[in-house]
């Protein structure tokens, strides 16, 4: 394995691919809800339903993508195929401006590509290191930070291109980014020769009437068509129900097979953390839907004579995550003293509290809009930044707990279940919540008048809902704190 003095050379090609994948995914995501409502003239109900269905299914398909990589394709081929599908999907999405029937197919292709890419790029990175290599953690941190760079730049670049040229050009820029990442990755192909490749024996093995490579081709053709039908008929919720039922059944099986009380206790903790994470992300994912439309309709986006494109506001969250994450890493050191469970609940309370504070600021912004016609941009930026800061106290804490569990062979499964619930189900619930803002009336000329009161109500309800979650978490935190203190007093 060729290395520099610090990291394997191959990591820089993986990091480049990750930057451009984030650029592609978040650039398109920043435009999607605005494209549906402003260009295709979907009503808010339809737009929210399709947006939440798309954001939900991108968290379901990585389960199948991981299986295909493990059994047939290998991580490297799965990542390349996924990147290619996402690029094609973004190009087809641009064509839907003149042929709306392409909309569902394009989103389905992106979902399939994301499934092959997302679950396997981290596994490919892991293949670059020996199990005990001390550089491993640094490599994953580098990839995560690089991804945030892509998600910061993407809404700015794609939003600007869309505003100055066209929607098709905005989506094409996302596709170009993904192609650029794939080309860079292919240029470093010689550095990945030691990683697992395609399982030729398994691909050529016959099953039923066809070899496995034939069934793989059938899957690559039919899966996008099937998912497109789910989008078209708004049947995505049924796929989520099936996936959730399977995930919960697997979780119950793991719990029943746990051998010690400590293992069962850790599993119960993970389940409760996942429940609060689900609620947190149902609130946080308003950023791409209801909050985006609120900014577009009710926020003064002018800086002198220039009007800031709505999509650019999607960069604030990612920027806050990266900046605050670096500050926290520098200022805060994990204490080895005290009870870890107590610390976990303290962090969750802080994360949910910050989410409540962020939506409180948005509620003030909406009330300002109701009083003066439009709200100020700095108030909006502050609210989004606080919400981004909140993320640092939820997912990293929950994922850390999952990786610590002392049950062999279940970490990957539990991670998948966590992503299913806090990703797919949370995005579906986010769509249900966002739909409450879709109240509108029509004036005499037939123009739509959107209700600012609906946004005030929803933002206020989320503020109080997140605050209620904080109250419950603080009760749990207090219970564990008193339990630890009682135990210490008994020992003394």
Curated annotation (Swiss-Prot):
Entry's Gene Ontology molecular function annotations: dipeptide transmembrane transporter activity; peptide:proton symporter activity
Q: Which GO terms describe its cellular component?
A: plasma membrane
Q: List the transmembrane segments.
A: 14-34, 49-69, 91-111, 138-158, 167-187, 212-232, 236-256, 269-289, 312-332, 344-364, 379-399, 413-433, 458-478
* Keyword tags: Cell inner membrane, Cell membrane, Membrane, Peptide transport, Protein transport, Transmembrane, Transmembrane helix, Transport
- HAMAP family in UniProt: PTR2_DtpD_subfam
Q: Which gene codes for it?
A: dtpD
Where it sits in the cell: the answer is: Cell inner membrane
Q: What does this protein do?
A: Probable proton-dependent permease that transports dipeptides.
Report which superkingdom the organism of origin falls in.
Bacteria
The entry assigns this protein to a family as follows:
Belongs to the major facilitator superfamily. Proton-dependent oligopeptide transporter (POT/PTR) (TC 2.A.17) family. DtpD subfamily.
Q: Which InterPro entries match?
A: AA/pep_transptr_DtpD (IPR023777), Dipep/tripep_permease (IPR005279), MFS_dom (IPR020846), MFS_trans_sf (IPR036259), MFS_Transporters (IPR050171), POT_fam (IPR000109), PTR2_symporter_CS (IPR018456)
Cross-referenced PROSITE patterns: MFS, PTR2_1, PTR2_2
One GO BP annotation is: protein transport
Q: How does it sit in the membrane?
A: Multi-pass membrane protein
Q: What is its main location?
A: membrane
Protein's recorded name? Dipeptide permease D
Q: What's a Pfam family this protein contains?
A: PTR2
